[in-house]
C-alpha cells in the first residue's frame, strides 16, 4: 500500500502467499479473467547460503515452492490468458545463477533459478514455433541492491546495481524482444566464461565467489 501511494497509476493489491500452491491458483484465476493485463512479471524469490546438508530443509522447501512452483503456476495461467488474446509479455525474474552450471553453498537457490531459465527458454521456443504475439523473457541479473542479501544471509563480493536501473533496463529489453536479459557487462562476461569452462571448473570458481559472500565465513 505504501508503494502504491508513491505511484501515479492506479494500483490494485491482491494478498497471496506464493509459497502455497492453492493460493497461487486462486490468484491466477482472478487475474486470468481480466483482459486489461498485458505485462506479467514473476518477481518473487529468495535464496539461502550454507553447506547443503546444513541448511534448513523447511527453508529449502519454501524456496522451491516460491522460486519454482509459484513461478510455474503463474506462468502457465498467464500464458494461457495471453495466448487467448494473442498478445502480452511475461518476464520471469531468474538470476545469473540460472545461467551457470551450479553454485556450491547456494545449491538449492542455483537449482531453482536453473529451472526458471530452462522453463522460460523452452516456452519461448514453443511461442516462436507457433508465431505467437506473446513474448516471454527472463531477467538474469547479478547483484542488485535489494533486501535479498539479508534474507539469504550474504554479502555480495561484487557491487550491486540499483533496483531502479535493473527494472528499467529489463523492461526496455523485454519490449525490444530480448529473451535472455543480463543487465551488466561483468555478469555477461562471467556467463560467457562459465560456458567455455568445464562444468566442474566453473562450479569451483563459483564456489570461491560464494565463500566471499558468506557472512558466517566458516571455511
What are the language-model segments listed below?
Residues 101-110:
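Active-site loop-to-helix junction immediately N-terminal to the catalytic Tyr of the SDR YXXXK motif
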Residues 43-48:
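Conserved NAD(P)H cofactor-binding loop of Rossmann-fold oxidoreductase domains
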Residues 51-52, 59-64:
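Substrate-binding pocket helix/loop in short-chain dehydrogenase/reductase
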Residues 95:
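Residue(s) in the substrate-gating loop at a strand-loop-helix junction
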Residues 75, 112:
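Active-site helix of classical SDR
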Residues 15-26, 57:
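The beta1-alpha1 cofactor-binding region of Rossmann-like NAD(H)/NADP(H)-dependent oxidoreductases
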Amino acid at each position: 500500500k505504501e508503494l502504491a501511494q508513491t505511484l501515479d497509476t492506479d494500483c490494485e493489491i491482491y494478498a497471496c502467499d506464493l509459497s502455497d500452491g492453492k493460493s497461487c491458483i486462486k490468484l491466477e484465476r482472478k487475474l486470468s479473467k481480466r483482459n486489461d493485463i498485458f505485462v506479467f512479471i514473476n518477481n518473487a524469490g529468495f535464496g539461502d547460503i550454507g553447506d547443503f546438508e546444513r541448511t534448513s530443509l523447511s527453508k529449502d522447501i519454501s524456496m522451491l515452492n516460491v522460486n519454482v512452483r509459484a513461478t510455474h503456476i503463474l506462468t502457465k495461467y498467464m500464458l494461457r490468458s495471453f495466448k487467448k488474446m494473442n498478445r502480452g509479455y511475461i518476464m520471469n525474474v531468474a538470476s545469473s545463477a540460472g545461467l551457470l552450471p551450479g553454485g556450491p553453498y547456494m545449491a538449492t537457490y542455483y537449482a531453482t533459478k536453473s529451472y526458471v531459465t530452462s522453463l522460460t527458454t523452452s516456452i519461448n521456443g514453443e511461442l516462436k514455433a507457433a508465431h505467437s504475439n506473446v513474448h516471454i523473457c527472463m531477467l538474469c541479473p547479478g547483484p542488485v541492491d535489494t533486501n535479498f542479501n539479508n534474507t539469504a544471509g550474504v554479502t555480495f563480493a561484487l557491487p550491486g546495481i540499483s533496483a531502479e536501473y535493473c527494472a528499467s533496463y529489463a523492461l526496455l529489453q523485454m519490449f525490444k524482444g530480448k529473451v535472455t536479459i543480463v543487465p551488466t557487462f561483468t555478469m555477461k562476461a562471467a556467463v560467457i566464461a562459465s560456458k567455455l569452462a568445464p562444468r566442474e571448473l566453473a562450479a569451483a570458481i563459483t564456489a570461491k565467489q560464494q565463500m566471499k559472500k558468506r557472512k558466517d565465513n566458516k571455511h
